[in-house]
């Protein structure tokens, strides 16, 4: 008797590039916006920009989830040296916890293309662990993508049912960029709990979780950050402290409820606002 190979159980952790997670990449609102780029300057003389492909928009909340799921699969596959991932769109959407239908298939195809074509510009902001230096130049999130809308064995059958072609999911092959893989393999990474990440329904909470893990990897159990800097680093479009607090409060409550934060306080000192985070223990955050 020939036994079918056992499927590898889904990875409970997700490895992500710590250098990239310290920088803003994804808009946290999918509402209409005139933003043509994301710009972040952590210090004088250093600048980070995210530029969409001509005619497209900046990566948003769905793209954020797609990108994290790609790295979930990279972790699950044992960090393949070539960075190549192969999957059906159907299985990918199911793993993301998304509805599977013709609309979401097209949404996923569009998102993968957007991630591939979005340009990242680093002026001494992106840290390259292999050279222990900050990079100058352009980067991409994905090196290559290809999507075969029909499995070869099914092509002749699908020709008999043309109405199914538009919604047929297809098989994707995606290559993660080498610079991010190099950092992760070198240990310059953050580690998320996949089950806990999936319970966070707020895009802001998901982004905050990743940013707080950057602070943890840099040796912080408590992290104080200026509210204005936090807004730029996430990024958030709101600028007034009262507006930012309204956006952050539900995310903070969600992170505390999930056991990822022990406490968070917003404090005003002179004319500036700060956020003080107390992180939960590592054993709870990777459960």
What are these regions (language model features)?
Residues 1-287:
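Charged, alpha-helix-forming regions
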């Amino acid at each position: 008797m020939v036994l079918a190979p056992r499927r590898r159980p889904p990875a409970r952790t997700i490895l992500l590039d710590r250098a990239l997670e310290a920088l803003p990449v994804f808009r946290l609102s999918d509402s209409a916006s005139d933003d043509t780029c994301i710009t972040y300057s952590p210090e004088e003389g250093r600048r980070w920009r995210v530029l969409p492909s001509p005619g497209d928009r900046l990566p948003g909340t769905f793209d954020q989830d797609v990108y994290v799921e790609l790295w979930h699969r990279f972790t699950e596959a044992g960090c393949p040296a070539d960075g190549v991932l192969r999957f059906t769109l159907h299985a990918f959407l199911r793993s993301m916890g998304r509805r599977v239908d013709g609309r979401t298939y097209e949404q996923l195809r569009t998102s993968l293309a957007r991630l591939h074509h979005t340009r990242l510009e680093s002026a001494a902001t992106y840290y390259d662990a292999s050279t222990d230096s900050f990079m100058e130049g352009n980067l991409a999130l994905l090196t290559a993508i290809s999507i075969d809308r029909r499995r070869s064995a099914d092509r002749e059958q699908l020709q008999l049912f043309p109405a199914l072609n538009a919604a047929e999911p297809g098989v994707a092959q995606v290559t993660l960029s080498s610079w991010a893989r190099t950092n992760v393999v070198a240990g310059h990474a953050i580690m998320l709990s996949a089950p806990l990440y999936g319970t966070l329904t707020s895009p802001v909470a998901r982004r905050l979780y990743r940013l707080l893990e950057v602070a943890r990897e840099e040796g912080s159990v408590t992290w104080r950050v200026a509210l204005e800097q936090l807004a730029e680093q996430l990024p958030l479009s709101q600028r007034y402290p009262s507006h930012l607090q309204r956006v952050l409060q539900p995310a903070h409550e969600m992170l505390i409820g999930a056991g990822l934060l022990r406490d968070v306080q917003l404090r005003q000192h002179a004319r500036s606002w700060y956020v003080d985070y107390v992180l939960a223990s590592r054993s709870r955050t990777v459960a």
